[in-house]
Amino acid sequence: MAWDNIPVTPELEELAQEVRAVCFGSLAQRSEVSRNTIRRFLEAVPRREDTLIVFDVNLRQHFYSHEILEESMQLCNVLKINDEELVTVSDMFGLNDKGGADDREICRRLVRDYGLKALILTRGVNGSYVFTPEEESFMPTPKVIVADTVGAGDSFTAAFVSGLLRGFSVREAHELAVATSAFVCSQDGAMPVLPDNLLRK
């Protein structure tokens, strides 16, 4: 896989100085070479007030570890996770060691413990949450005829980040993310052309 050997280049180091948002995941960090490059890139990104560094947990098979997840959560300021991944992370990090904590409590704890600007929790047909230090936004999942769920999570994240970069409130960015993800699920393929009503939002 190409992402198993991402080298550090002068172009990459220069790009790190210019980005307003960057998204990374756990799978591309399965090789030491790419993991080191990703870490160096993230450490080079200037920590401006509006810079978004998004960690999409994106657990796949056995290609993750406590160390990779811990370091990634330390480096990000926005965390994207789904309900199944939250169970795994919660167990791995002992976030529900006394039992009884619900998903929302665990998410609020992650926001607090890692100093996050936002945490996105997607729950499939059961809706989605966005948590920040100041607020909590819930939105139900729209009912659509599902053609293909590939790309649903990525489109959600991309739309949410795009909204924040354009000055949307957390709630407005959340609404855009939900609408975009629902549309993607109704289309074949991971990258359908978005309709004008979404592009104009």
Stretch-by-stretch model annotation:
Residues A44, F93-K201:
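Conserved phosphate-binding/catalytic region of the ribokinase-like
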Residues M1-N36:
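Conserved phosphate-binding/catalytic loop of the ribokinase/pfkB sugar-kinase fold
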Residues E18-V19, C76, L116:
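Short, well-ordered alpha-helix to beta-strand connector turns
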Residues R35, F63-S72:
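Distinct, well-ordered alpha-helical segments
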Residues E14-L15, E71-S72, R112:
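Structural alpha-helical scaffold elements that stabilize or flank donor/cofactor-binding regions
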Residues R48-F55:
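Short beta-strand/loop segments at the ligand-binding rim of alpha/beta enzyme cores
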Residues C76-E84:
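Non-cysteine beta-strand/loop elements that form the S-adenosyl-L-methionine
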Residues L27, N58-R60, E84, G124, ...:
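Active-site beta-loop-alpha junctions enriched in small/polar residues
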